[in-house]
Regions:
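Residues in the recognition helix of alpha-helical DNA-binding motifs
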Residues: 4
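C-terminal regulatory/effector modules of DNA-binding transcriptional regulators
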Residues: 113-116, 122, 126-271
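Long amphipathic alpha-helical segments
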Residues: 9-139
Length: 271
């Protein structure tokens, strides 16, 4: 370990007493890059990994996660999500390939089951707790561009905007998640105050599509004033009549968002 630290392969910080310690985020990065197994995850505060079972051949990762969420097995769900990240999967992959299909199935349970809403709400809380735990393991950029956003007014979904913030953090942004049900006026105030380079707006449910069209026009004007871009996503965008302007882009998935951000960052930093 000392050799790896001395060679610069793993970050070291000094305590107030002058002792050297490895920040958790640096340890996690090193584990992911080297594909190392963690023998005692509880030392890193990742005891949930012990609850994550070996992959079942007959079940997809999304099906495994769905089963844990439906049964309210919080530790197992958190451990499974952590295991994917530690194995080297990106946040976009975890969101698109595992969480999205699991929650799409759970979200339709209420159609055939009287306890469907209860199961969905509990599963959402478990999922959010897992993402917050995982978010704490991401290396936090100290000098990257600012990004901020949330779910639109009337949209109470928390998982999508949380995942977007995590994807952007993973790609070097200092992301500020404003959460669910964010009025356009509040988003405008945030843009004016924080001067972000990138804004995101999630729309999985719209109370008023025409009002949202007007919101996008107002948002475009604010983006122009502060030389920012916005990325939009969510199921509700399919019915929009307002064409996307030069400051607005649509991402149909987290993977598409990550690819677009990589290209955009490269264009911004290329002389």
């Amino acid at each position: 370990m000392k050799r790896w630290a001395d060679d610069g392969h793993i970050g070291i910080a000094k305590t107030a007493g002058g002792h050297r310690r490895i920040p958790i985020a640096d340890a996690i990065r090193f584990i992911r890059e080297r594909h190392l197994a963690i023998e005692r995850p509880e030392i890193l505060g990742l005891g949930e990994l012990q609850a994550a079972p070996e992959a079942q051949r007959a079940a997809s990762p999304a099906d495994q996660l769905r089963a844990f969420l439906v049964d309210g097995k919080a530790a197992e769900a958190r451990g499974l999500i952590l295991s994917w990240y530690l194995a080297g999967q990106s946040i976009a992959t975890i969101g698109d390939e595992h969480l999205r299909p699991a929650f799409e199935t759970i979200g339709s349970l209420w159609l055939d089951s009287s306890d469907g809403i209860f199961v969905e709400h509990r599963a959402t809380e478990i999922g959010l707790a897992a993402l917050h735990q995982l978010s704490a393991l991401l290396p936090v950029p100290t000098s990257g561009p600012v990004a901020l956003g949330g779910a639109c007014s009337g949209d109470t979904s928390l998982l999508p905007t949380t995942l977007v913030a995590m994807v952007l953090t993973e790609h070097g942004f200092r992301a500020q998640n404003l959460g669910a049900n964010t009025p356009i006026a509040s988003l405008t105030h945030a843009i004016t105050r924080e001067r972000p380079a990138l804004v995101w707006f999630s729309a999985n449910h719209l109370d008023d599509a025409r009002a949202f069209d007007r919101d996008l026009i107002a948002l475009s004007s604010t983006l122009e004033r502060f030389d920012a871009m916005a990325i939009l996503g969510g199921r509700a965008l399919a019915g929009l009549s307002n064409p996307m302007g030069p400051r607005l882009r649509v991402a149909r998935s987290l993977t598409e968002l990550a690819a677009w951000v990589d290209g955009w960052n490269q264009r911004r930093t290329t002389p």
